[in-house]
Amino acid sequence: MLTKQQDAYGRIVWDHLHGRPLREIVERDDGWFDTSSAAPRYFAEFRHWPPHQRAVMKYVCGRVLDVGCGAGRCCLYLQKRGQPVVGIDASPLAIQTCRERGVKDARVLPFTRIHRGLGQFDTILMMGNNFGLFGGRARARWLLRRLRALTSPNARIVAESNAVYQTKNPDHLRYHRFNRRRGRMSGQLRIRVRYHRYCTPWFDYLMVSPDEMKAIVAGTGWRVQRFLKSSGSTYVAIIEKDGRKRGG
């Protein structure tokens, strides 16, 4: 669990909830950093979501595990639809924010610590580029196998990522080469988030092309069924369990 000083992301969403202006800093391990006011989109209502995110929600069925639930926007939308949903996040303050906003079942739990005690799910939801929480190729394949044990026979994973090779930014292209030289995937970011005096530990966040995603998923008991594109480099994958019945 993140300590109070490490929970920079949680402090960002908590402060936004309470009307405090903010700027977050994302720092990468090659020295690159960026600042943004991203918090409003963590709170956006469904009608303000990007079109591709709205479109994929028709694939979100049954009992849902929202991985990296943040401020709870997906949980709240699914609750309004009448679906049971459990939101998990490594950030204690993000979970506190979810609860204050009305999320019924929000738990402080890192993705790597998911367990059978959570119950069985029909959809694993990973929006907001949260395929990135798989971290890297090996950990992704390990977690995908774990997810098989937590999901129903006709389960799906609905996961958003960013096709990193579409960039023309020389800093990002240089980072891709830097990663490949040290045996990492091009889009395997090593980052941390800063906000005022708060700073997360360094963590891996994985962005992949559609072909890379297919290769990661292959042989784990899941398969990519389709991709839904956005107007930019982000996209959503519908990943189905091997042996899933059509129409289920």
Mark where each language-model region is:
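Conserved alpha-helix/loop element of class I SAM-dependent methyltransferases that forms part
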Residues: 43-63
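Class I SAM-dependent methyltransferase "Motif I" SAM/SAH-binding loop
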Residues: 68-72
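A short glycine-rich, Lys/Arg-flanked "PGG" loop and its adjoining helix->strand segment in the class I
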Residues: 140-153
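Conserved SAM-binding strand-loop segment of SAM-dependent methyltransferases
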Residues: 102-113
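A short SAM/SAH-binding and catalytic strip from SAM-dependent methyltransferases
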Residues: 121-141
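SAM-dependent methyltransferase
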Residues: 11-15, 152-214, 218
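Conserved SAM/SAH-binding beta-strand->alpha-helix loop
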Residues: 91-92
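N-terminal auxiliary segments of SAM/dcSAM-dependent transferases
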Residues: 1-27
